[in-house]
């Protein structure tokens, strides 16, 4: 049987459980452990039924095991990951961080994954970042983008207490990613918790300022190419319509604009399909883990 990277999931909540189902389908990753702190959590119960070794005794239990993971996916909280990250590093365990801790470099698969395959710890930014930064990157690789603004609208019921408590952190982290990874000179991020019932799937609007003489066909083609790339790991990611180009106006600060509308429908592995905002995080994290495993196993001669 082909070799797979041994994986531990730290956290046993909604995101961790959805991630588990994606990892179970992977040709490169083998989930072996799920670590939580709540012995009654549904995530631990499901993981145990699926054959994983589970514990509610936290990260220290995992690190005390004689057989250790190659990779850890952590979906706890920023402060928990900041405490655990040095322990993973000391044990030689690579970490994929789904919290806002940002201990390691931020990764958006279509934009900069190849640059960070050797990093001991990588951060998945935010759901809004995973959904919108690829579009900013698609535009900025064709023309200069002096300003980009993203608006992420997610179903209110999909936003848990952690998201609600960290709205400011969400916007700052996403805006920073729009600049550092997306390539915009300045960036802004807005999140809307949509209270509609039945819940609406995630929808995002991405505004990019562009030169008035920009090659619009090249920009549109680049956007379509990046959307196709994201769809390889998030099939429910799609354009709502063609990118819209607007001439400079007072409303746009005198700059030409390209506006892109996308929506993200989840795969429904554990979370409902409307929770595309959470699904894109687990799918992107799985993609990153698989690419790290491919690099490690192929270069190391395990395959």
Swiss-Prot record:
Stored NCBIfam families: ac_ald_DH_ac (TIGR03215), PRK08300.1 (NF006157)
Outcome of substituting residue 41 to I: 6600-fold decrease in catalytic efficiency with coenzyme A
Active site: 127 (acyl-thioester intermediate)
Uppermost EC category: oxidoreductase
UniProt organism field: Mycobacterium tuberculosis (strain ATCC 25618 / H37Rv)
Name of protein: Propanal dehydrogenase (CoA-propanoylating)
Binding, NAD(+): 12-15, 158-166, 277
Gene3D superfamilies, sorted: Dihydrodipicolinate Reductase, domain 2 (3.30.360.10), NAD(P)-binding Rossmann-like Domain (3.40.50.720)
């Amino acid at each position: 049987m082909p070799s797979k990277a041994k994986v531990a999931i730290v956290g046993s909540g909604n995101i961790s459980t959805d991630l588990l189902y994606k990892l179970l389908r992977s040709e490169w990753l083998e989930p072996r452990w799920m670590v939580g702190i709540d012995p009654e959590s549904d995530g631990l119960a499901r993981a145990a039924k699926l054959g994983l070794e589970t514990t509610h005794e936290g990260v220290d239990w995992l690190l005390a095991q004689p057989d250790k993971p190659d990779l850890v996916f952590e979906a706890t909280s920023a402060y928990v990951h900041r405490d655990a990250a040095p322990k993973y590093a000391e044990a030689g365990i690579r970490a994929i961080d789904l919290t806002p801790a940002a201990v390691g470099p931020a990764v958006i698969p279509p934009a900069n994954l190849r640059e960070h395959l050797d990093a001991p710890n990588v951060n998945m930014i935010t759901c809004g970042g995973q959904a919108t930064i690829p579009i900013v990157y698609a535009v900025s690789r064709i023309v200069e983008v002096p300003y980009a603004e993203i608006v992420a609208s997610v179903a209110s019921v999909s936003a848990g207490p952690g998201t609600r408590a960290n709205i400011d952190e969400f916007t700052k982290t996403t805006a920073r990613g729009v600049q550092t990874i997306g390539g915009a000179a300045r960036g802004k991020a807005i999140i809307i918790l949509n209270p509609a019932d039945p819940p609406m799937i995630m929808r995002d609007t991405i505004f990019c300022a562009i030169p008035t003489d920009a090659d619009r066909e090249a920009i549109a083609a680049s956007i379509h190419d990046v959307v196709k790339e994201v769809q390889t790991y998030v099939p429910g990611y799609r354009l709502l319509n063609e990118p819209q180009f607007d001439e400079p106006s007072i409303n746009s600060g005198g700059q030409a604009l390209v506006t892109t509308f996308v929506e993200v429908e989840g795969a429904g592995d554990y979370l409902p399909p409307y929770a595309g905002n959470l699904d894109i995080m687990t799918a992107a994290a799985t993609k990153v883990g698989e690419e790290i495993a491919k690099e490690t196993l192929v270069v190391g001669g395990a395959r």
